[in-house]
Regions:
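C-terminal "cap" of GNAT-fold acetyltransferases
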Residues: 4, 192-205, 210-228
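A short helix-loop-beta-strand connector motif used in the catalytic cores of GNAT acetyltransferases and
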Residues: 87-105, 121-126, 144
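Conserved N-terminal entry element of GNAT/NAT acetyltransferase domains
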Residues: 4, 31-75
Length: 228
C-alpha cells in the first residue's frame, strides 16, 4: 500500500475572505468556471494540468516537500505509489504526459499556488472510508474529486474554492456528468488534515450531501452540465 495518504491532501479548508474570480487564458486551456457572486483580490487563473503546465505543478510540489514527504499526489491512483519521491514524481509525470491524470491548477500571476485533482473512478479508484462507501453505494459517479492542495503562504485566501470551481468547469468541458466529492467538516478536522476538502467549500459550489461514510466524512454530489 502507498505510504502517501490514500486520500489526497487539501490544505485550504476554509477561507477568511471570498474566493477570487477566475479569468480565461485561451492559449493554455484556462477556464472561467462557476461564476462566483463576489469579487476579491487576488485574481486567480486556472489552467488544466498537462504537459504545458507540468513544470509549474512540479515546482509547487517540490516547494512543499513533495507533498507529505514525497507523495506527489499519487495516493488516489491505482499505481504502486511509494515512499520514494523520485518514483512518485516519475509516475505522476508519466500519467500527465499520457493524459491519465487530471487537475485544475490555480495560478497567481505566473506561479501555481494550488490544485484540485479529479478523474473518472478508474483513474482515481482509491478513496477513504471505502467499506462504508461501498456499503451505501447504489450508482457510480462519472467523476470524482480526489483531492486539492494549497501551497504554504496561500492558504485561507480562496485558492481551494477556485481550484474546485476550476475542476468543475474542466469536467464540463469533458462532457459533464455526476460528480462526487468526499469532504469533511472544517469545524471537526484541522485544516492540514482535510485531504478531501471542507464540506462548506463543496456546498458553496452547489454540491448536495448524499450520505455520511465516516465520523466527519460525507459523500456529496453535483451534476455538471456539458460545456458549450
Amino acid at each position: 500500500m502507498s505510504a502517501c495518504p490514500p486520500a489526497g491532501h487539501l490544505a485550504a479548508a476554509t477561507t477568511k475572505r471570498p474566493a477570487a474570480p477566475l479569468v480565461r487564458d485561451e492559449e493554455a486551456r484556462v477556464v472561467a468556471p462557476v461564476r462566483l457572486d463576489f469579487m476579491a483580490e487576488p485574481t486567480y487563473t486556472v489552467k488544466a494540468l498537462d504537459e504545458s503546465t507540468w513544470a509549474a505543478f512540479a515546482t509547487l510540489v517540490e516547494r512543499n516537500n513533495g507533498i507529505f514527504g514525497g507523495c506527489w499526489c499519487m495516493g488516489f491512483h491505482d499505481d504502486d505509489s511509494r515512499t520514494d519521491p523520485v518514483h512518485n514524481r516519475a509516475a505522476k509525470e508519466r500519467r500527465v504526459r499520457d493524459g491519465r491524470a487530471h487537475a485544475a491548477l490555480v495560478y497567481e500571476g505566473d506561479d501555481c499556488v494550488g490544485w484540485c485533482q479529479f478523474g473518472a473512478p478508474d483513474e482515481v479508484p482509491r478513496i477513504k472510508n471505502r467499506a462504508a462507501y461501498d456499503k451505501g453505494r447504489t450508482t457510480s459517479p462519472d467523476w470524482r474529486i480526489a483531492c486539492c492542495y494549497v501551497g504554504k503562504g496561500h492558504r485561507r485566501q480562496g485558492v481551494a474554492t477556485a481550484a474546485l470551481a476550476g475542476a468543475l468547469d474542466l469536467i464540463a468541458g469533458l462532457g459533464g456528468g455526476t460528480v462526487e466529492g468526499y469532504p469533511e467538516g472544517a469545524d471537526a478536522v484541522p485544516a492540514g488534515f482535510l485531504f478531501n476538502g471542507a464540506l462548506s467549500t463543496y456546498e458553496k459550489l452547489g454540491f448536495i450531501r448524499d450520505r455520511k461514510i465516516g465520523k466527519h466524512r460525507w459523500v456529496v454530489t453535483r451534476v455538471v452540465e456539458p460545456g458549450s
